[in-house]
A protein has these predicted regions:
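Extended alpha-helical scaffold regions
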Residues: 1-171
Length: 171
């Protein structure tokens, strides 16, 4: 007679399920982070050839890190948000880009390396602050200015200069 294994592996959940219905997570935080990292680089590698597939993969990473996972995993969400913003900009989906931008700004508390967060914001402002879409540009500049706690002095000044240039060009 075959001895019954008290654990049954369920492929779809990546969990070990005990015979009593309880479960044991197979992924540790490190394994989860490694999985997110692999997914991120897979999505990034297909971005040039298939924007729609890359959008799906980056969105999947973002959604996987929605809950209360460790802060180290939040970095992959942050990186995915930046990539999603780039794709939506390419596709001229400015409303979607703004939703992602707001979500990215709200990650300020979760990114341990504040220099990384702030330097990313500088690059984002440089990239999208040159848009020819005045409606988008105004919203884009105003959003972080409405939350000055996200900004250091350099970013605050950079955004205000962008705002002045925008207003000057508007007249």
């Amino acid at each position: 007679e075959e001895e019954e294994d008290p654990f049954e592996y369920e492929d779809s959940d990546d969990e070990m399920v005990a015979s009593d219905g309880g479960s044991f997570q197979e992924d540790s935080d490190e394994e989860g982070e490694e999985s997110l990292e692999n997914q991120y680089y897979s999505a990034k590698s297909i971005k040039e050839d298939d924007l729609d597939a890359a959008l799906e993969l980056f969105a999947k990473i973002k959604d996987q890190v929605e809950g209360g996972e460790g802060d180290k995993q939040k970095v992959w969400k942050f990186k995915s948000l930046k990539q999603l913003m780039k794709i939506h900009y390419q596709l001229n989906h400015m409303d979607d880009l703004m939703k992602l931008y707001k979500e990215l700004l709200n990650m300020n508390d979760y990114i341990e390396d504040k220099n990384y967060f702030l330097s990313s914001l500088v690059k984002i402002i440089d990239r999208y602050g040159k848009s020819n879409n005045p409606e988008f540009l105004e919203k884009f500049i105003e959003l972080p200015l409405a939350h000055p706690s996200y900004l250091n002095d350099k970013l605050f000044i950079k955004l205000n200069i962008a705002k002045l240039n925008f207003l000057e060009g508007k007249n």
